[in-house]
Each structure stands twice: as structure tokens, then as C-alpha cells.
Amino acid sequence: MLGTPQTQESENKPLIGDLGFGSNNLQPPDTISGILSIHPLGEPCHSVTPCSQDTIEDCALSSTPVANDTNSTCTESEIGLTDDDCNLEEKEAAARAKSDIGEADDSPFEVVRTAVSNSDNPAMPSMTFRSGVLGVFFVCLISFVNQFYWERDNPIALNLLIVQLLCYPLGVAMAWGLPRRMWNCFGYRWTMNPGPFTIKEHVLISLMSNASAYMALTVDIFAVLRLYYNPSFSLWTALVLLLSGQLFAYSLAGLSRTLLVLPASMIWPSSLINASLFRTFHEHQPEFDKSINRASISDSKVGLAVESSLWARDGKQGLGVLSFSLDWSVFSNAFLLSPIATPFWAACNLFVGFVLVFWIALPIAYFNNLWGAASLPLYSASVFTTNSTQYDISRVMRNGVFDAQAYEQYSPLRMSLEFSWVYGIGFAALMSILVHIALYNGKEIIARVRETKTKHDDIHGKLIMQYPSVKAWWYLVMLVASAAAGIAVGVGAHVGVPWWGYILSFAIAIVLIIPVGIIQAVSNRQPGLSLVAELLSGIVLQGIPTGYSILKLYGHGSLAQALSYAQDMKLAHYMKIPPRQVLLYQGIGIVISVVIQTCLFFWLVDHIPDMCRPEGYPWVCRSTNLVYSASIIWNLIGPLKVFGEGSPYSPLLWGFLFGLFLPIPVYFLQRRFPRCTWLKHVYIPVVLSGIVGLPPMPPVDFPMWFLFGFIFNFLIHRYWNTWWQKYNFTLSAGLDSGLALSGIFQFLALSQNGIEINWWGNQVDRQCPLSAQPWLTP
């Protein structure tokens, strides 16, 4: 059990950081079972001493969490409530009698038994004043920060890990400082402070916040409509469409919970890491290293994480050779995520793929003028004519749809060599992950699907059954209502997509949710979904550029969000959170985040000159411009013309075959040489996936990102492991948070007042300007 002292044998097992702990969720096979109950600051587990009446105030004031499980003996009368208000001790005794179980009654899977408790305390507070206030606070914070930075040159993203680390001290502070008296409101008795900050409150806050973590991706869809296709596209239309897409995704996740969440065989490995982290906060008593001043560490986090306008950095258009930067947003952003929280084996795979393609193959092909690419910029996400000018879509459109005759008279579409190669590598990555999953996880997936009947109700399923469930028809009503609202508003607002285009988008998500969800729940890997939606939209909605936006929103976006919500539901399942409370908190998080992010984007567009254009730096909207270019490639002109016969880019279709066969020799080599240490960490889908993100990510970010990963997760991990265990992940969270706060401060205090700080190294127009020019003159 996690609440007992660790033996010497258990301390030698792999650490969380070795298993892909962090936002990227990349874990090598057969190592997730090594998850230990290691404190995020690196401390091993210790037993927790129950607090007595004499020490209750010390428990509340202490930075060490009180164990909020069935081992706690603290009663409500001991924290300021009278015995007449309630007798928590009696409630907990009854709860223990109801939910105590034997060691043999546990999950059938060792990996789950290692990370998740097989007991529950139904009397533990979860839906409280504290969890509501902190949940709303972090939803607003994450929604604002992620959307604010998403359109900037180096976007950052606050995620679940940040919330887990930051909300804990706030929860402990509220448990210490809030009044503990009982209140009567409409016959309901409640208190602001039911006692020590509990693990269930912590989980609910994180689930509410995580509902908004990656919603900025879908806002790009409306950014393209607003900026390029329909300047009159209104805020209210965007709000309804985005809200309908998110609620459709959530209801789809809820309807699929019987197959993706409840079965014991659907493990969702990433949820195990989060569950283990929650338990380390609330079930252990870390002994901090007194030789390290935590206050000075905290100060340095914010001091170092200063935004790009103040630190030296490289230009953005080259390939990043010998690049150097002191800007933390280069090292940790929404494209690459924190190098400190990325396992070193994954960083090596990503960087090797980057070097092979961008530093070796791409320059050779470019300077040999492959496909006439030398007359275009080396790195660009824009689309061009054969004369190397920016592609003017108004020349090939009539009444909002594609005009084939005008296209023949104007120019075929051309892409930079780097941009076109990314599509070819994307084709290979899609096939390679399917083959990789079949080779490495195929038998496991088949076994887990068969076990959904025989191992449906493990101990976690039995314990969660004591709480009222969410009725399936609730989700069904939500799904139908959100889909109907999306169709009605989209057609009524003349977005340009026929009603059946919306139906097709919904059908894509409905058909793929179960098979893709099973793959992700078992293997912790999600097949590439974006290309599937792009291919279908280009085939069935060719000539309608706005069709790309709708299929990305409801087809790809809703499916990806539904899988994220399903993963969060599994985390709540493991942590024994009442399902109806999960529905309420996640629903509130979705609504708040949609309103904040959509309104913020429209405000930025109206108040920032030249937004999403090079002249508007740093508000260059890399991801938005990529979506715009993709809408031209896939829907306006169509894949048959761009990648079909007669096009210079037709050889890129060989990427499908290349990706199909590439993982096979690696698989057999790993079986042939099982003792080869480096070979067992080679993962072709990871090698290819790092390349697919360029663009929108600039190549200049990669070298410094890998350097910091090498320093922290190789050198420090190997030679200063005690420090690494204690401070590695909290340092990453502190740097990301400090960056977000400092950037907002600079925008409000400096940029909004017309103040610019210019010195050598931070002027983007003087950083290798030739890198943005073509090698050959057209």
C-alpha cells in the first residue's frame, strides 16, 4: 500500500520521471507497471500519523497534507464544528465498515494496483466551497493564459500538471484560513471549511480546469473564418458553435463510458500517473531537504521565466543550426511542452528525427532545387503560386466556392519544401503508429477487449457504484441538443457548409470514438486523427474552404476532446469521485472556458493591429495561419489536385507505404537483441511525430529544448538524482507559471502603453533576415 514505508527493494524501481511523467504522456511499453508512489518532489512514501485533537491546528498549518482517507481520525468537532452539527467520526466509521476490503479484492491488473488505492471513504468531502472556488479560478486562469499566448510567436500551455501542483498549497491555505462555522441556505447546511484539504477536492478542481486546457486549438477554426473567409463572422455564432462542439464531445465521452471507462481492462495509463501524483500529495509526508532553500528556488522560477521581449533569441525562419536563446517560451511551449517534464528517451527520439530530416535531408534537397523549392522560402507555412508570390484565394473563388477554370488561369498551388515534407512524414506517421500499436500492443488490446465482459466490475467499479450514476439519457439529450444547435446556427449563419456536412462531421466522431478510444486506453497512444478528417473533408467537401473548419471542429476536434474527457472520467473513476459531481464540474469548466477563450480571441482581433500577420509580431498566429493554409490545400483546391497525378507533390503519397513498413525491422531487431539498451528505446512513431509539428513550431526551438532536456533529465538525473527527485517537476511547473504571469504583466504594463524594450538579441527583424528569403530568384 502507498501509505506504508518503502522497502529498499521498492526504492530501486523506476521513477515516475523515467516513465514519461509530464504532459506529453509518452511511455515506453512494459514500463508503466513500474510506477511508484514517489512524491513529486522526489520523496519516498512514509506512513501518516493521524492527527489528534491537540494537534489539529498544527495539521492545518503544516505544509504536509493530512491523510484524507479512512486512516484519518480527525472529526468535525475537532475542527471547529459542534457534535450537534454532525459526527464525522461516526460517519467515517460507517463508511469504513461499508467500503473496507481485503487485499485480495483489488484490480486484476498489477499496474493499477500499484498506482490506485483499492479503498474509498464516501464521507470524505469533495464538492465543497473550496473546490468550487479554486476550480472556477483555475478554469478562468488556464482559459485566459492559454488563449492569450496561443496566438503569440511561442505559445505556452498550462495543463493538468500545473493545476495539480499549484492548487494544492492554495487548498491547504484555505483549509487553514477559512471560517469553519455551519451555514443554512434553503434548508441545505454547508460550511466553507469542512476540514483538511482532501484528495477528492484536489481531483475535482483539476478535472474542472483540465476541461479548458487545450480548447485554444478549436478556436483556431473560428479564427480562420473570422480573419480570412468571413469578416462578419459574429461572436455569438462562434460561441454557439464552439459550445455545441465541446458539449457534443463531452456527451459522446459519457455515452462511451460503458466501454471506455467502466471496464477494468480499459486502463488509460496516463490517468495512473495522475492518480499516483494525487496520492503522493495527500497520503505521504515528504521530508524536505533542509539544505536547499525552497524560497530561493521559488524566486528563481519566476525570475528566470521572463518573456521573449526581454531575452536574447535566434531568428525564426531558419533550421535552428547553432541556435541559442534565453527565452523560456522557446524551451517550453504548446508545441514541444516542457523539456524538464519530457523523459529523456522520448526527447532523444524526437531530436534524432529532427536532425535527420531538417539538418541533413532537407538542406540537401533544397539546395538541389527539388520540385523547384529553391525559389521559395526554406521554412514557411504559407502557400504560393508558381511565381513564388503569396497565393491569393480570391482569384480562384466565386461566390465562396472553388472555380476550376479560374484556378487553371491563375496558378497551381506550391508549398515550401519543408511544409510539403511535413505532410509526407505525416502520412508515414499515421501508418507507423497503427503498425506500431499492432506489433507492440495488438495482443494486449485483443485481450482487454475480451476481458471487458469478464473483468468489468473490479474493486474500483464496485466502489463507484455506491454513488448515484449519470443516466445515459442525460448524455443522449445533451448530444442531440448540441448537434442540433450546431447545425441550426451553422446553416443559419451561412458558414458555407451544407447541413449534411455537419452530419458527416458528427458521424466521424461517433464511429471512431470506440476503436480509437480502446487503442488509447490500452496503449496510451492516439492514432493521428487530424489527417483522417482532412482527407475526408477534402474528398466530400472539395471546393468549400469553410468545410475544413466544420469537419475539424466536429470531426477531429470533438473526437480528440471526447477522448480527453473520457480519460478524465477514468481518472475520476480511479479516485472514486461521484459521477454526478464530475458531470457538474466538467460541465461548468467547459462553459466557462468557451466563453472566456472565444471572447478573448475576438477582443484581441479587434484591439491588436495586424494580428496574425508578420507585421503584428509577436501576434503572428502560427497555428491559425497553418489552419488557413490547410483549408486551401485540402478543401479549396483539394487533395486530388495538390497530391494527385501531375503534381510535384505526388511522391509524398509513398509516405503511407513507408510508414507501414518502417516499424517492422525495428520491432524484430529489438526482439533479436533484447540486451541492446539504446535499441529498446527506439520508437518510430515518436521519431516521426516530432517532425509533424513543424510547422507551426519553428525549428529554432528544437536544439535548445533538447539541450535543457539533456541537462535536467540526463546529467542532473544521473549525477544529482536527489535534487532531481525533489525539484525537477516542480521547477518545470514554476517556470511555466512564471512565464505566463510575466508575459501577461508585460502586455498590460508595457505593450498596452506603447512601451517597447529593444536591445541586441531581441529584435526579430534583425535576426538572420536572409533565412526568410528564397535561395534562387524566381
Give the residues covered by each predicted segment.
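Alpha-helical multipass membrane-protein architecture
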Residues: 2-778
